[in-house]
Curated annotation (Swiss-Prot):
Cytoplasmic membrane side: 550-1040
GO MF: ATP binding; metal ion binding; protein kinase activity; transmembrane receptor protein tyrosine kinase activity
Lineage, opening ranks: Eukaryota, Metazoa, Ecdysozoa, Nematoda, Chromadorea
Listed GO CC annotations: plasma membrane; receptor complex
One Pfam family hit: I-set
The name this protein goes by in its record: Myoblast growth factor receptor egl-15
Active-site residue numbers: D797 (proton acceptor)
PTM comment: Activity is regulated by the phosphatase clr-1, however it is not known whether clr-1 acts directly on egl-15.
Family to which this protein belongs: Belongs to the protein kinase superfamily. Tyr protein kinase family. Fibroblast growth factor receptor subfamily.
Reaction catalysed by this enzyme: L-tyrosyl-[protein] + ATP = O-phospho-L-tyrosyl-[protein] + ADP + H(+)
EC number: 2.7.10.1
Subcellular location: Membrane
Domain of life: Eukaryota
Species whose genome carries this gene: Caenorhabditis elegans
Residues covered by the Protein kinase domain: 640-931
Length: 1040
């Protein structure tokens, strides 16, 4: 243990470190089989009962096999009596029916796979029915006659208070067959009853087969007992004794189909001094657990990690046998009641099982036992927490440096978070020969010099759960130094340390006598104060004078402008843009056209008419702007009818509308329009997007422009309607186990909010979503981007939120508010102050504000990652100021859960740092088309095409990319495989729309910046982008 601690401590000083256990790697340890349930390994059963041996294992990627043994000998299929023993290899269970004496002993199972094996033993003990009446509390008059006869003919006088001499062959004759079945061992002889037999004449036993089920006799009689008399059955009729039987217990002799122990109860005992008495076979009583009070008897709390099986027991007694009803949070549970994720509740006879429990299964459960006499309840408080398969986490800021005086007490606190049971110790790091570490020749590594604090007499260590406290009493200068808290479990170890500083006693000089009187105000102080007051007065007078002059000039200028005129009309003119000599765009506008605002004066009469029209309609402040009409795309306003709003942003709205193309043809469309609070800049942006739609043309995977409403009145841009909303929300709707992220109205930005499905438009989900569907989505987007690239259009904002899902799940690329036409240059340089989505931006765009088609390829790789994670948020654990530095150092996102190897290769090739090494959209379309058309066997066998595609883009130097390391470990996954998300999702959903971050993130390397309120991490402006330093050394790369 000490050597292992020293090896772990040798990693580093004054920082949290982790150390993995030596021996099995985590890869092997996680794949060793483990049992799913905690099984009962000892069974005490009666003859004729049934047993189920459970060796089921938890879900794993590695197939496991089970073998069954009887007394350490393998049970082969040809040696098994199939009528008695049945194997269930799928559920890894063994069913043993019709228990007889020969089944008593050891049964075991062994589960194994390629990584290891586990075993479980079961002990079976057959309890004789008559052994129950050996308890001294049961009066001898209540013992069934068949048991007395069995003990007599088996020559086992097990009860000394029974008069065996009074038991005759006539009384025992009707129990002959039952006596054989009840025997723990075969009787040495079969009793012979009748006049022709002697009293104890016997016939040798020749053969004993497997005992069958005891005969069920429906005739149940009453018994009349006399004081101190033997048991003699008295019949109500003259029926043959063999046709009736005496029953003293309420024993259910039918086969128990449940996996729980059967209840047996006896009638009320008869006192020895009782007279002639009639006994009832059973007595009605209400359900109860430990008492007969119909009140809440139990209130249990069950807390366990996710993935375990939760079992709530509600074993109740009573007659008639109670019926159990389960409730969760006050609602009755049925077999049709659904759990989170599509799982079902498992109802046993006396218990409720919740397999693979998740956090959503937490809540208040209670069971109610009912019969016709009464009821009883039992309550359970269930808490399910997520598992953490990792070494312990030492909570930061708990263990802090201490500074105390000599002879005082120093106290250090350490708190650990761990799913597994952690082990915590305290050590002191010693400095020997000027160094805290030394080189261990046998281990060939540096280790710390340390001493465990348990060996110190004046140190006390106290553990309470996951918290530990180190207390050092009567500290001295020798105790000054570094103390560390070490915590470990089966997955590794973590360390945190703090420094203890001991203060010596210092001499304090105290002044005595009266304090001298000193004049605090000197002549220079008076002069300085006077000058300051004069300057403040002068500044105040100057400010008042400035405001008065400004108001006067403003009023004069307004009067001059309104002489004969009251307003100006502004026309939005779109014309061809003249090219500069350097053939480079000079601002943010697209190159083929330019948008200008031309003002023309209007008369008072025309201005008054416009003012009345504005007040009586939906026109906004922008009503004085008129956009030149385009006859090719113009749509009459009278043919549009707005239905309801689909989405909105800070200055824009998207409405669902109906467009009447002809008298008899009416279609549903989407209309983009500006809000009343919009300004001139937003109008120009909407006009720019409209012109981009006109330049692009039509393609199946690009949102189609239907027309626009220009001229006098608000500007409407009419596009086709995609009823399933955007791709991000469509994919998140297929997530079965998590809440969909909702966006509050306070998080709206200047961008138009992506359309989200409302109650009026239900998303048509794909019933069985497979990897082929996801690759099909990626192929459609690549086709649309290939079309835009052929048109020399740079999208600049390619993301899942800007891809819409139409009829038949056809994807449409939309939102061209940031798109630019680069017919002349093949690139575009950003010079304005617009906002940009940095999570989807390429390195060259973050570094130099340069955008090319290859920049869209980078964004396509991020969108592909969103598709494979069903709408996950990229870089959820990296703060935005650190993103650029991490990307420059070679970091790329890890492969999504169960992502095919070929798809992740494609992502990594899109994230190449050099532009020329990224594939074109034409190459991406061909590659995805190859994946969709080839069969699974062909994909695995056609590595030549796959290797050639990626080898052409491999770099000659630099760190190993995630693609190369992933290629060595990942296996091919067929596209027909279902998309199985883990019970606890690996890819977080964070809100993608945030405002500009104005607060620097806290200096905490362990903090996960996912939807952090202190860090707005989606969109930045060029001013705030300067906070991303270009020097890689100044940024700390987080650990992954």
């Amino acid at each position: 243990m000490s050597y292992f601690l020293a090896s772990c401590l040798g990693v580093g000083l004054l920082s949290t470190v982790s150390c993995s256990l030596q021996g099995l790697t985590s890869h092997y340890r996680e794949n060793i089989p483990r049992f799913k349930h905690v099984a009962n390994e000892r069974y005490e059963v009666f003859l004729g009962d049934e047993i189920k041996f459970d060796c089921q294992t938890a879900a794993s990627k590695i197939s496991a096999f089970v073998e069954w043994y009887r007394n350490d000998k393998l049970l082969k299929n040809d040696q098994i009596d199939k009528d008695k023993i049945r194997k269930d290899n799928n559920r890894m269970m063994l069913h043993l029916k019709n228990i007889d004496v020969s089944d008593q002993g050891l049964w075991s199972c062994r589960v194994h796979n390629a990584y290891g094996q586990i075993s479980r033993n079961f002990t079976v003990e057959v309890i004789d029915f008559c052994d129950y009446f050996l308890f001294p509390d049961i009066h001898h008059l209540n013992i069934p006659m068949e048991c007395v006869c069995l003990w007599k003919y088996n020559k086992e006088a097990k009860r000394s208070d029974v008069n065996y001499a009074a038991v005759t062959g006539e009384v025992c004759s009707k129990y002959a067959s039952r006596m054989i079945n009840r025997a723990r061992k075969p009787l040495p002889m079969i009793p012979c009853f009748g006049d022709h037999c002697k009293e104890f004449d016997t016939t040798p036993v020749s053969d004993f087969g497997l005992p069958g089920k005891p005969e069920d006799d429906p005739l149940v009689k009453r018994v009349v007992l006399k004081k101190d008399d033997v048991i003699v059955p008295v019949h109500d009729s003259e029926e043959s004794p063999s046709e009736s039987r005496t029953e003293f217990i309420n024993a259910d002799e039918k086969e128990n189909k449940e996996d729980e122990e059967e209840d047996y109860s006896v009638s009320q005992p008869v006192a020895p001094d009782a007279g002639l008495t009639e006994l009832n076979i059973t007595a009605e009583e209400p359900p109860y657990f430990k008492s007969n009070d119909n009140i809440v008897l139990f209130n249990e709390t069950h807390a366990l990690p996710a993935g375990r099986t939760l079992k709530l027991n509600c074993r109740a007694k009573g007659y008639p046998e109670p019926q159990i009803i389960w409730y969760k949070n006050g609602k009755m549970l049925k077999k049709s009641s659904a759990r989170s994720g599509g799982y079902e509740f498992k109802f046993n006879r006396w218990s409720l099982e919740v397999e693979d429990a998740v956090v959503a299964d937490s809540g208040e459960f209670h069971c109610e036992a009912l019969n016709k006499v009464g009821s009883a309840k039992k309550y359970f408080h269930v808490i399910i927490v997520n598992r953490m398969r990792r070494p312990p986490i030492i909570v930061p800021n708990i263990l802090a440096n201490q500074s105390v005086n000599i002879n005082d007490t120093a106290t250090f606190h350490c708190k650990v978070v761990s799913d597994l049971l952690p082990h915590i110790i305290w050590v002191r790091i010693n400095k020997i020969n000027g160094s805290y570490s030394y080189y261990n020749n046998s281990a060939e590594e540096y280790m710390f010099n340390y001493t465990e604090m348990d060996t110190f007499d004046k140190a006390h260590v106290h553990h309470v759960g996951d918290e530990s406290t180190l207390t050092i009493f009567n500290v001295s200068l020798d105790d000054q130094g570094i103390y560390a808290c070490l915590s470990g479990n089966s997955l590794g170890m973590s360390m945190a340390n703090a420094t203890l500083t001991v203060n010596e006693f210092m001499a304090i000089h105290l002044l005595t006598g009266d304090e001298p009187k000193i004049d605090r105000w000197t002549t220079s102080d008076y002069i300085f104060t006077t000058i300051l007051l004069f300057l403040l007065l002068a500044a105040t007078l100057f400010g008042i004078l400035f405001m008065v002059c400004k108001q006067t000039l403003h009023k004069k200028g307004f009067m001059d402008d309104t002489v004969g005129l009251v307003a100006r009309k502004k026309r939005v003119v779109v014309s061809k843009r003249p090219m500069n000599e350097d053939n480079e765009n000079s601002d943010d506008e697209p190159s083929p056209y330019q948008i200008q605002i031309i003002e023309t004066p209007i008369t008072k009469k025309e201005a008054a008419r416009k003012q009345r029209k504005r007040m009586n309609s939906e026109n906004t402040v922008l009503s004085e702007y008129e956009v030149d009409s385009d006859p090719v795309w113009e749509v009459e306003r009278s043919k549009l009818s707005l239905v309801h709003m689909l989405g909105e942003g800070a200055f824009g709205e998207v409405w669902k509308a109906t467009y009447k193309e002809t008298e008899n043809n009416e279609i549903a469309v989407a209309v983009k329009k500006l809000k009343m609070s919009a300004h001139e800049k937003e109008l120009i942006d909407l006009v720019s997007e409209m012109e981009t739609f006109k330049v692009i043309g039509e393609h199946e995977n690009v949102l189609r422009l239907i027309g626009c409403c220009t001229g006098a009145g608000p500007l409407y841009v009419v596009v086709e309607l995609c009823k399933h909303g955007n791709l991000r929300d469509f994919l998140r709707a297929h997530r079965p186990k998590e809440e969909k992220a909702k966006k509050s109205s306070q998080e709206l930005t200047d961008y138009l909010e992506p359309r989200k499905a409302s109650d009026k438009d239900d998303i048509e989900l794909i019933p069985n979503l497979t990897q082929r569907h996801l690759v099909q989505f990626a192929w459609q987007v690549a086709q649309g981007m290939n079309f835009l690239a052929s048109k020399k259009i740079i999208h600049r904002d390619l993301a899942a939120r800007n891809v819409l899902v139409g009829d038949g799940h056809v994807l449409k690329i939309s939102d061209f508010g940031l798109s630019r036409d680069v017919h002349c240059n093949d690139y575009y340089r950003k010079r304005g102050n617009g906002r940009l989505p940095i999570k989807w931006m390429a390195l060259e765009a973050l570094d130099s504000n340069v955008y090319t088609v290859e920049s869209d390829v980078w964004s396509y790789g991020v969108l592909l990652w969103e598709i494979m994670t069903l709408g996950g948020t990229p870089y959820p654990t990296i703060a935005m100021p650190e993103l650029y530095a991490n990307l420059k150092e070679g970091y790329r996102m890890e492969p999504p859960h169960l992502c095919p190897q070929e798809v992740y290769h494609l992502m990594c090739s899109c994230w190449r740092e050099k532009l020329e090494e990224r594939p074109s959209f034409k190459t991406i379309v061909d590659y995805l088309d190859w994946m969709l058309t080839m069969t699974n066997e062909t994909i695995e066998g056609s590595q030549e095409f796959n290797d050639q595609f990626f080898s052409e883009r491999s770099t000659a130097s630099g760190p190993v990319s995630p693609m190369e390391s992933f290629q060595k470990k990942r296996k091919h996954r067929p596209l027909s495989a279902p998309v199985n998300l883990p019970s606890e999702p690996q890819h977080t959903i964070c809100d993608d729309y945030e405002s500009n971050f104005s607060v620097e993130p806290p200096n905490d390397p362990n903090h996960l910046y996912c939807n952090d309120n202190m860090l707005k991490n989606h969109i930045i402006t060029p001013e705030t982008s300067q906070r991303i330093p270009s020097n890689n050394n100044s940024m700390s790369k987080p650990e992954f």
